[in-house]
Curated annotation (Swiss-Prot):
GO terms for biological process: positive regulation of protein ubiquitination; protein ubiquitination. Part of the SCF (SKP1-CUL1-F-box) E3 ubiquitin-protein ligase complex SCF(FBXO33) formed of CUL1, SKP1, RBX1 and FBXO33. Interacts via its N-terminus with YBX1 CSD domain. Directly interacts with SKP1 and CUL1. It comes from the Eukaryota. This is F-box only protein 33. PANTHER family: F-BOX ONLY PROTEIN 33. It comes from Homo sapiens (Human).
Length: 555
């Protein structure tokens, strides 16, 4: 379990007025008195009778005899507030009294937890949430399912079985692992929700569930979920707890739920009071597993969220009526919109209700800083042509394909329509056969990626895998954008060379490519050698969710 906590440092109040200056002076005098008392107390503890040598006095501070354990809790918390997180944890190990003061609410305003879906995480999570769940103001939890498809676990046979019988055994073992990870996932989610059900201080609440690995085997809810939770009691309990948290909240400004298995329902947001909904600043509800025409939020429900600065939804749920609601005079201008376009949603939901070009123009008129981030999973070119309206202020776009490849025409369209806005362009193709990547420049006079770099003058990130990138075009991209292109990630297997470059015996083509691209960018560059190290490829859902969070916060 990875844990990130913020350490609040005391700051004086503002001094813009005479009264403010007086408050600052009083605050500084008070802090100085506190520090003097603290130094005096430490000197007394060092110099008390029987303390012995200077070394003994120093060492005794950590022991019961020196009186460190008898310090008032307020003073210990005050000492903790000056320490960075690692030192704070080490200091709490001195005695039980100091450990009791470690979880004082003022010391833990934020909790950011990344959990492996493993039974070993449960006792640690229970301890932490029992200590902090009732008062924490910002809680971000990510559930990371291990890739059980890789197999090879201890005692699983290690691939020794062959033939039909071996395949059946492997399928049974794989099924058992799916059931175990799903059962653990539900328990961990319950642990988090139970601990914060009565927390009225909660201001930011973010949940991410990495269930994409599980869904690779098909319809998760119809197979493994029915075995783990046959009567649906746990799922219903989780949904009720989530709604209870929303109904009990009084200060919630940020609600984000992405790819969490059947936690959010179409009726969940109705649990929020009007007072909380009216002050909500960020809302993201991402779940491509919702069946049929169901949506997690409707245009009528969105009317209550008059203070939204950022919004993240499934593209098929973002309708023309929603765009109209967001442009109403009683709504504050929307600054950031993140949209997930998934082939599963497109197959089950219609694109007929999506905003037209006039709706996008109205949103841009209401806020000149309005920007859009789109993530597209396996979307056909004809559908992308419908989605990419000219007036969308598209700043970031991420293509992730398994079956359907992006065409050169789509890349060319993006470079022409969004040249004033585009900063991030990601092109990922998870193909099994790496011997023949699609070539976007095929039958074209100019390479679409080079044109993208030429037209989009704000481009700062370009990542490509699974598409042929010619070495001379890569050099051209680096020279066109120069040092403004902060990130250029291209996998080694995606790069190809002309026969003329390979035939030149005097020049090493790979070395020349690295040298020329580095010169163009003004910084050292090399191709991505190990695709597994590229998180945008191995964990596209998590990458999109984290980027969506930072995109929404960057206002």
């Amino acid at each position: 379990m990875l844990l990130f906590l913020s350490v609040p440092q005391p700051r004086p109040p503002g001094a813009r007025t005479r009264a403010g200056a007086a408050r600052v002076a009083r605050w500084r005098r008070l802090r100085l008195q506190q520090l003097r008392r603290l130094r005096g107390l430490l000197r007394v503890l060092r110099g008390r009778p029987g303390a012995g040598s200077r070394r003994r006095g120093r060492m005794a501070l950590c022991g019961q005899a020196a009186g460190a354990a008898s310090l008032p809790s307020e003073l210990i918390v005050h000492i903790f507030s000056f320490l960075p997180a690692p030192d704070r944890l080490r200091a709490s190990a001195s005695c039980s009294h100091w450990r009791e003061c470690l979880f004082y609410p003022a010391l833990w305003p934020q909790l950011r937890i990344c959990l492996r879906v493993s039974p070993a995480e449960q006792p640690r999570l229970e301890f932490l949430m029992r200590k902090c769940g009732w008062f924490v103001r910002e809680l971000r939890v990510e559930f990371a399912a291990e890739n059980y498809l890789s197999g090879g676990g201890p005692g699983d046979g290690g691939g020794a079985d062959t033939g039909t019988g071996g395949e059946e055994v492997e399928a049974l073992q794989l099924s058992a692992r799916w059931l175990e990870v799903l059962r653990t996932y539900l328990e961990l989610v319950l642990c988090v929700l139970v601990s914060i059900r009565n927390n009225r201080n909660l201001q930011k609440f973010s949940l991410f569930g990495d269930i994409s690995v599980l869904q690779q085997q098909g319809s998760l809810s119809n197979t493994y979920l029915s075995k783990v939770d046959p009567d649906g009691k746990k799922i219903k309990q989780i949904q009720q707890l989530f709604e209870e948290i929303l109904s009990n909240s009084r200060q919630l400004k940020w609600l984000s739920c992405g790819f969490m298995l059947e936690i959010v329902t179409p009726t969940s947001l109705s649990s929020l009071s009007n007072a909380v909904a009216n002050t909500m600043e960020h809302l993201s509800l991402l779940d491509n597993n919702i069946p049929g025409n169901s949506t997690l939020i409707t245009a009528v429900e969105l009317e209550r969220f008059v203070n939204l600065h950022s919004l993240a939804l499934d593209f098929c749920d973002f309708t023309a009526e929603m765009a109209r609601v967001l442009t109403d005079s009683n709504h504050v201008p929307l600054q950031r919109l993140s949209l997930l376009v998934h082939n599963v949603s497109v197959m089950h939901k219609s694109l007929d209700n999506m905003p037209n070009d006039e709706h996008w123009k109205a949103l841009s008129r209401k806020s000149t800083s309005f920007r859009v981030y789109i993530m597209a999973f396996d979307i056909k070119s004809e559908d992308m042509l419908k989605i990419l309206k000219p007036s969308i202020p598209l700043e970031r776009i991420h293509f992730d394909s398994y079956i359907t490849c992006v065409s050169g025409a789509i890349v060319d369209l993006i470079s022409r329509q969004y040249d004033k806005f585009l900063t991030h362009f990601i092109l990922m193709n998870d193909v099994i056969d790496t011997s023949g990547f699609p070539d976007l420049s095929d039958n074209r006079n100019e390479d679409p990626l080079v044109l993208l770099a030429w037209r989009c003058t704000k481009l700062s990130l370009l990542a490509i895998h699974g598409y042929t990138v010619w070495a001379h075009n890569l050099i051209a991209i680096a020279r066109l954008r120069g040092s403004d292109l902060k990130v250029l990630e291209v996998t080694e297997e995606s790069i190809d060379f002309d026969q003329g470059e390979l035939a030149d015996q005097d020049v090493d083509p790979v070395h020349n490519l690295i040298e020329q691209v580095s010169l163009g960018l003004g910084q050292p560059w090399h191709a991505v050698m190990d695709i597994e190290s590229l998180s945008v490829f191995t964990e596209p859902n998590r990458h999109f969710y984290r980027e969506m969070q930072s995109f929404s916060e960057d206002i």
